[in-house]
Amino acid sequence: TVKEERYTSGVTQYPPLLSPILALRTPPGTKMVVTGFTGPYKLTDEVRNQNDEIVHICAGSGVVPSFSIIKYDLRVNEKLKHTLVYSNKKHEDIIFDEELAQLKRDFPDRLKVIHTLTREDDPTSFGENIRGGRISQPLLSEAIGSPEKTAVFVCGPDHHPWQKKEAKEKGETLPTSFLQSALGFLAELGVTKDQITKESYG
């Protein structure tokens, strides 16, 4: 069921984009076509052939496209190693927790997963490679090691253009987003822009 999102000027953060079209302008019986992977957030042959490892830095539901890449590549190819740095608030928020654990058992030499939990009192009690706090430069340095022959995929929350516009009009500074933090740390570690594939939501 698709419900129309309402928009009230001055109250709603920004106008809804898709739900009014689906809820109000799409008659019953309309056929929809669901396509495969599109857009820049995908593992191309060029990236696969030029690198030995892919490091994925994700937060929340941003893990979904990277999980698809990891799962497919581990099963279809034999070369690349993958490291996933995955940030959530609570342990119960981890998406694909069991699936990732199974992939680690199936491919112990090719997949490493590091979880960071920002709102757990004792995150290490949940198991190995589970850390507390937000992503940091030392954590990404540990995950990446030497940036040579490494590509990085980053997916997580960033500020929506409407938020940026509103903050600018009010003369306010928005807090640093997950995506901004990750890209800043990567630059400090010497990872170049052409090594990074990014996607955000907000």
Language model segments and positions:
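Histidine-anchored nucleotide/phosphate-binding helix
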Residues: V63-N77
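Short, Lys/Arg- and Gly-enriched loop/turn segments at beta-strand edges
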Residues: S9, G39-R48
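Ferredoxin-reductase
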Residues: T1-T30, N88-K90, T118-E120
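Reductase modules of NAD(P)H-dependent flavoproteins
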Residues: V85-G202
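A short acidic Gly-Thr/Ser loop motif
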Residues: A59-G60, P157
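Conserved S-adenosyl-L-methionine
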Residues: Q50-D52, L74-H82
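Conserved beta-strand elements of the Class I
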Residues: E53-I57
